[in-house]
Every structure is written in structure tokens, then in C-alpha cells.
Amino acid sequence: MSDQAPEILLAHHLKALKLPTCLREHHKLARQCAAEGVDHIRFLARLVEMEMIDRERRMVERRIKAARFPAVKSLDSFDFSAIPKLNKMQVLEMARCEWIERRENAIALGPSGTGKTHVALGLGLVACQKGLSVGFTTAAALVSEMMEARDERRLLRFQKQMAGYKLLIIDELGFVPLSKTGAELLFELISQRYERGSTLITSNLPFDEWTETFGSERLTGALLDRLTHHVSILEMNGESYRLAHSRARKAKTRP
């Protein structure tokens, strides 16, 4: 057996076992451990730990990509002082994701620009980091996709996909009224997810104005009954979060 044969065989096995980090790092780590007098058991432990850490990072990246977030935003970058009515401790408690494990819902209410989407994205990011499947969409886009899927006779498959997320974030509910068919399709999806998965909705409308979006008091009442059975309400009333930060940035750039 040539001197290169064991190295070639090892590389082949590591590729077959799908251990790219071990393949990439084993030479460097072996030299480092030899210099430090580290035995083979500790060398293997370090190498496997590197693989595990890298694998988890890649899995988180895949979950974030699959979620289709419009932007990746964390709760760490959210200025809670700009929205004093928002309960910071409630949001940080929700970041533990136990409410998702319990299949509960969340609704963020407040005027446009108060940071509802940022908080929703932050909670979605944390869920991805904790190994949970997340989907993000706007209410208008979701309804449009469902109507298109219905016309193409793949609605059941699409609904199954949406119902399968541990957390489904529906942004901007109430920005535009829904058609009768669109409202019924959205109600059907939320009903399918009821006590099977968590749904986080952001809306610029208080509950008593949701009928304007759904066009039916009966449908709105039934929807709210399902959403609010187990729910966390995030009150986000106040001056526009985006406007306040825009003013702050301009103030910093002034001579």
C-alpha cells in the first residue's frame, strides 16, 4: 500500500459518510493535537465536535433559507425603548419558543411602522436556531398563492405544506381586504393549523376591525375563536418605529 493510499481511502470514507468538516479539518487538527501532546481520543472528540457545530450551523442556514424571510433580523437589534408599550419581557419569554412547542399562537397589533414585522422576524429566526421549521409570508401573498394553487388543482398539497410548519408567520393582515374566496381559504388554512402548529399574525387593525378584511362577521368570529384560544397578544402601539429610527440616523449625520 502506498503512502497516499490511506489518505485517499480516508477522504473517500469521510465523503461517503457526509462529514465535510472532518474532511477539511482533520489534517490541521491532527498537527495541532500532535504539537500539544493530545491523545487520539481527545483528537477524535475535537474533530467530531467541529463536525457537529458546523452541521448545526448549516442546518440553521437551511431552515432560514426555507423560511423565505424578506430579511434576517434578530431581536437583539430591535430597539424596545422606541415602543415602550411593547412588553419586552413577554417577547424575550416568547424567544424561548415554548409557546411554539405548545402549539399556541401570537398576534402583534399596532399601527404601520411600529416594528411588528421586525419582532416577527426575530421570533422566527430564534425558532430556526432552535431547530423548528418556520414559514414566512404576507397575508396577501398567501391568499394569492392559495388561489393560484386551487386553480391549478394543487391546493391540497400547498395547504399540507403550509400546515406542516411548526411556526407560520402571516405578516400584514388587514392591509388589503380579502375577497370572499380568499378569506375562506385563509380561514381554512388557519383551521387546519389549529392546535397542530403555531401561527404568528401581524396586523395594523384592532380585532373589532378585522371584519373589514374578511368581509363576514361570522367568518371573522370563527377565525378569532381559533386564533385566540391559546394566544399571546403583542401590543405595539406608538410612534412609527421606522420614522423614529430615520430621524435618529439623520440627527447623527448632521454636522
Language-model-detected regions and their locations in the chain:
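Extended interfacial segments that mediate partner engagement and assembly in macromolecular machines
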Residues: R55-G110
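Walker B motif beta-strand of ABC-family P-loop ATPases
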Residues: L167
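Interdomain "pre-motor" coupling segment immediately N-terminal to P-loop NTPase/helicase cores
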Residues: L19-A71
